[in-house]
């Protein structure tokens, strides 16, 4: 695996290998690189969980993290992302984790020698979040085959939903969608069934809630926080109807009492904090696999 750009680019075998490596890290596996290794985290959109968990993952692996601030870089002078990465490559940086507001920003960057990990591209994909979601689900249920999984909320604007719906169907899960119709596209019906949240709540194994992404909406929104919560959110009353072994997930940040009742965020069924914890281990696995492959290819080229 040279880069991690999208979930669609991963084979099922590669996904399973990453999940297994993450499990090993969670259970105490240690890993460092023999050669000095450098990473740069280039975030052009705000981030808490993805940014910090990648940095923790890098440091746990013994990777040296190079500071980068987009607002003080030469990109403010018109330098392209390609040329910025070419610079990073030239000075010896091995891997770049990038979050960008543009979908498919990585087109044309794949042939650079520096490895690229997509930390989220606009409304496109968020592969490391998708992998940590898979890791969390597999920890709970041991399989994806036959699981009923609900994806609820601002689906159209969610890169997490875009990544998850495709891979979960590939892995054998049955998907259900819910949320405002104007934030849903009929093309998603290729992956699952649209229902109201009340129609699905009693049947699903995983209730995956999505943040209302106000920053990606144009025009006036027709929902207040209270009205959205009442119509589309996981209220305390709805949560009481969940199956006994069902779990609640959310990629965060959470809008409490909008997508999910405040009292449910840290409830017994919630795996929201677990997802954050698992993010470090899956990102360690991603970096280890990519950097070891990069090292292997470099050695082959020297012979």
Curated annotation (Swiss-Prot):
A cellular component term (GO) from this record? cytosol
Class in the EC hierarchy, top level: transferase
InterPro entries recorded: Asp/Orn_carbamoyltranf_P-bd (IPR006132), Asp/Orn_carbamoylTrfase (IPR006130), Asp/Orn_carbamoylTrfase_sf (IPR036901), Asp_carbamoyltransf (IPR002082), Asp_carbamoyltransf_Asp/Orn-bd (IPR006131)
Sorted alphabetically, the keyword list is:
Pyrimidine biosynthesis, Transferase
Sites binding carbamoyl phosphate sit at 49-50, 99, 126, 129, 252-253
Instruction: Write down the chemical reaction(s) this protein catalyses.
Output: carbamoyl phosphate + L-aspartate = N-carbamoyl-L-aspartate + phosphate + H(+)
The UniProt similarity line reads: Belongs to the aspartate/ornithine carbamoyltransferase superfamily. ATCase family.
From the Swiss-Prot or TrEMBL record, give the protein name. Answer: Aspartate carbamoyltransferase catalytic subunit
Give the source species: Listeria welshimeri serovar 6b (strain ATCC 35897 / DSM 20650 / CCUG 15529 / CIP 8149 / NCTC 11857 / SLCC 5334 / V8)
